[in-house]
Amino acid sequence: MADVERLILASRVRVEITDPRDIDARYCLRSYFEELGRRFDTGFDPAQSISASDEEMTLPNGLLVIANLLGAPVGCGALKFHFDTQIAEVKRMWVASDVRGLGLGRRVLERLSAEAVSRGMASLRLETNRSLSEARYLYERAGFVEVEPFNNEPYAHHWFQKDLGHKY
């Protein structure tokens, strides 16, 4: 019965593009930073990380999606578009710990992929920290392959890329 209830709960989640200055977006981004601070061996200082500013997460430069369950924000993910290379960077992937296992990370990533394709992107890139093993598993299951480092993100240990199946 618990599995059925979890499936019903997951079906009630909505993943929508949201202004990064919105209160739900601020909550998700703050929660994301706090979790990284707890989980990374060295802690996490957003000022030391490669940026994903509000402007970079706002169309036409990029976008932010929020997963919302029964009126509460429970996850997020963002894209930064690089139109010159047709690459979109996946940033700020986070799902609240109490709703993990419902497939919300996959749904956020699928929405980001669809948004990237609709804007002419040929591939997605992302980087992640070694302490986020569940994130690496999600990315691999979603078709991302580990590649050589493509940036100098100080908190990254793994870099991934996914071909979106077309070139413009």
PLM regions: where:
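C-terminal "cap" of GNAT-fold acetyltransferases
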Residues: 1, 7-10, 14, 20-21, ...
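Acetyl-CoA-dependent GNAT
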Residues: 10-87, 91, 96, 109-110, ...
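Conserved G/P- and acidic residue-centered "switch" motifs that form tight phosphate/ATP-binding loops
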Residues: 71, 103, 120
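Active-site acidic-Proline motif in GNAT/NAT acetyltransferases
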Residues: 96-98, 102, 130
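Short polybasic/polar patches that bind polyanions
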Residues: 100, 117, 140
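Residues forming the Rossmann-fold NAD(P)(H) cofactor-binding site
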Residues: 102, 106, 110
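Conserved GNAT acetyl-CoA-binding A-motif
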Residues: 109, 114-128
